[in-house]
């Protein structure tokens, strides 16, 4: 099974939203692929679940989150060898954190441009995030099976 890891700073907003959208869309088309998510600087967010505005948008999309009650996870707590693709949500924000984490130096990380609140409103970032995830799933469908 193909596995994707979405990464943001705190693992409560963009990466969690992307994980839930990806898994919903992949299940819908019977794609043998699943996503998970983690944060680069989880810190005190380890006691937080998915951000309420992300939950609200998922509800509007009729997506029932599978991990809505689970707490944030730091990227260092995962076996990164399990993932075929690692995507950081915002290059400008996340690349310095990736560079500071020696565990991540040898990984091939894809960077998106989904900017966090308050820099960009959720009315812009969440639809953009959905579109990027949907495009990723559609690309996976078209990719030849190995």
Where do the protein language model's features map onto the residues?
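A short, aliphatic-rich alpha-helical micro-motif
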Residues: 80-81
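Phosphate-binding/catalytic loops
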Residues: 94-146
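Short glycine-rich anion-binding loops that position phosphate/pyrophosphate groups of nucleotides
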Residues: 10-12, 91-94
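Conserved active-site segments centered on acidic
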Residues: 1-77, 145-146
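Hydrophobic alpha-helical segments
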Residues: 22-25, 53, 90, 98, ...
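Active-site loop/turn elements of alpha/beta-hydrolase fold enzymes
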Residues: 40, 91, 114
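Receiver (REC) domain switch/active-site residues of two-component response regulators
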Residues: 84
């Amino acid at each position: 099974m193909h596995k994707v890891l979405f990464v943001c700073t705190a693992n409560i907003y963009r990466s969690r939203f992307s994980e839930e959208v990806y898994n919903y869309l992949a299940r819908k088309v019977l794609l043998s692929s699943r996503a998970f998510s983690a944060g680069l600087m989880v810190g005190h967010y380890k006691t937080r679940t998915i951000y309420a505005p992300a939950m609200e948008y998922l509800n509007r999309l009729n997506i029932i989150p599978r991990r809505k009650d689970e707490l944030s996870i730091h990227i260092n707590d995962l076996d990164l060898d399990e993932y075929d693709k690692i995507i950081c949500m915002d290059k400008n924000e996340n690349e310095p954190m990736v560079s500071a984490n020696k565990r991540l130096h040898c990984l091939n990380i894809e960077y998106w441009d989904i900017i966090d609140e308050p820099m960009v409103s959720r009315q812009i970032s969440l639809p953009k995030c959905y579109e990027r995830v949907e495009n990723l799933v559609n690309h996976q469908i078209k990719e030849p099976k190995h």
